């Protein structure tokens, strides 16, 4: 605030004393003035071309400073505010200015969109004909379970027991399946965006890196599922900084009533039980239950943190390993697996408590991506693009 006031005073002073300070023309020649303007903007034109030539969101290799500043260290997850502070405001501006969100499809027109709209409107009318309940009549809890993916699906992994028996049992009785994640070992916010808003990342330009910073600010209308709920009944819970991935800005624009986090928001988490390198899933669930009101239909967007890397746990009698893995890789694997077992137990307790509440409640539970502990050889493919590396 002080800097804004100071800047205004400087501008006013320059305007007020302009005739005394600037007597006559500093550069009398029009040609020289035009040349100076061109020289000022010439470097920016080169920078603009450099940013425009990015591939898959990465600056072309060999560009001094920029490749080290952006490609080597991934800072997008820290949000626009931190990016501007660490990489400069102009860096963020140029990146946003040159990021093309989506390529215009062939035969794109209002008429073609109207045709699609009417087709699916009629289909929706048919599907909803005999449905008596509206989604806003119940409470919906989206649980993004950090890095949750069954290790037994990785070929060659040996486990002394099933570490997620409750989750696997629930999958047999309720709607379930495998989800394709866009990321491997990361990309949480992108999966969060897609589940909330329903816009698949594969329809967007490959230069898009983080949906919350590259796409979200450009949306004139945000078709979030939370729109079906009153603003006062929208909650986000994440036991990390609210500023990560610009979540504070995102959930504010989505008109969420409260964002329960560690910092960056007035609504601080009340329950914090340490686990591994972060906080337990039990802590996350307890904070959800703290705000759950049976008298209201609420929407919760919940992101856990327990299973985020690095992974620390006491495996006890649990034995998990894969032949060909290094000692450190197997160490991470068994610790991660033990944390999954804790997730399974805490999720079971959470669902049991929800079942005792006199209110229709639906829980959408999913893992955002595989943990980044597996080497490429684990997928029997040449790279991490193998489908098995992206199924949770």
Describe the predicted segments one by one.
Residues 1-137, 158-178, 215-219, 223, ...:
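N-terminal secretory/membrane-targeting segments
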